[in-house]
Regions:
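Exposed beta-strand-loop-beta-strand "reactive/processing" segments of non-cytosolic proteins
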Residues: 139-143, 197-235, 244
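Short, aromatic- and glycine-rich surface loops/edge beta-strands on solvent-exposed regions
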Residues: 146-160
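Aromatic sugar-binding surface patches on proteins
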Residues: 124-140
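Edge beta-strands of extracellular beta-sandwich domains
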Residues: 160-171, 231, 243-244
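Short, non-transmembrane alpha-helical segments in secretory-pathway proteins
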Residues: 99-123, 167-210
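Extracellular ectodomain segments of secreted/surface proteins
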Residues: 48-107
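Gram-positive cell-envelope targeting signals
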Residues: 1-58
């Protein structure tokens, strides 16, 4: 009878160990489920907010058009911009104003220069200032060049009378600034989600059309901690060509 009792005792021991193992597995599974539920509850609002937000509302500097013209000795660039005032890369968007910025590169900077042009039936003009560091003339006025395909600029440089027929660098395939930003958000979903809280986007966005032979978009995400996450996009597809963080 003793061997039988030993076998029964062994069976009971194995049974209890099996039950204990099952219980541990069940509690482990419950723990995993709870952790997953907590993670979903924490991140879901952020992801949802990132999907619903219109990040274009956080653009605090916009360059939507670039027009260029050049001769053998001169080159002219005109930008359609919207900028906040006062201008500060501090991660906070402020009220913006539309401006036309005109840059003139000349053989020398020792002559007085005046520029005149017309857009939307309105005439604009004035004396251009000279930047000794950039070695170019500059003029800014409250005007909208965002939809202009061509603009004639009349420049008086010293005793010379110059006419520049400036043409936009945009092509039929060039994305609008808003669509370009949407493309970036699609490609950088995790980054945008990490920079979004229950109040919205935690910074400001610089969005500039640029031209280096071909049109591109520069996008800068500026947060309040001073970090700048910069992207170079193909203007016709929104594809990220380069990126860096400073």
């Amino acid at each position: 009878m003793k061997p039988q009792k030993i076998r029964n005792t062994a069976k009971k021991s194995i049974f209890h160990e099996s039950n204990a193992l099952v219980i541990r597995i069940v509690w482990f599974a419950i723990g995993i489920i709870i952790l997953f539920a907590v993670a979903v509850a924490f991140f879901a609002p952020l992801v949802s907010a990132a999907k619903k937000l219109d990040y274009f509302d956080y653009v605090s500097e916009l360059r939507s058009n670039v027009l260029t013209a050049e001769t053998e000795e001169f080159s002219l660039r005109a930008f359609a911009v919207e900028k906040e005032y006062p201008y500060a890369a501090d991660g906070v968007k402020r009220e913006m104003t539309k401006r036309a910025e005109i840059y003139l590169t000349a053989p020398a900077g020792d002559e007085l220069a005046h520029v005149n042009f017309q857009v939307g039936g309105e005439k604009y003009g004035g004396e251009m200032s000279y930047d000794n560091v950039k070695e170019e003339y500059f003029f800014s006025v409250s005007a909208d060049l965002s939809k202009a395909d061509t603009v004639d600029f009349f420049v008086e440089y010293g005793k010379e009378q110059l006419t520049f027929h400036a043409v936009t660098v945009k092509k039929q395939t060039t994305l609008t600034p808003k669509i370009a930003l949407d493309k970036l958000k699609e490609n950088e979903t995790e980054l945008f989600s990490s920079l979004t809280d229950e109040h919205g986007f935690v910074g400001e966005i610089y969005l500039r059309l640029i031209c280096e032979g071909e049109p591109y978009y520069y996008v800068g995400l500026i947060t309040k901690d001073g970090k700048v996450r910069a992207f170079l996009l193909a203007a016709d597809t929104g594809k990220v060509l380069a990126k860096r963080e400073t």
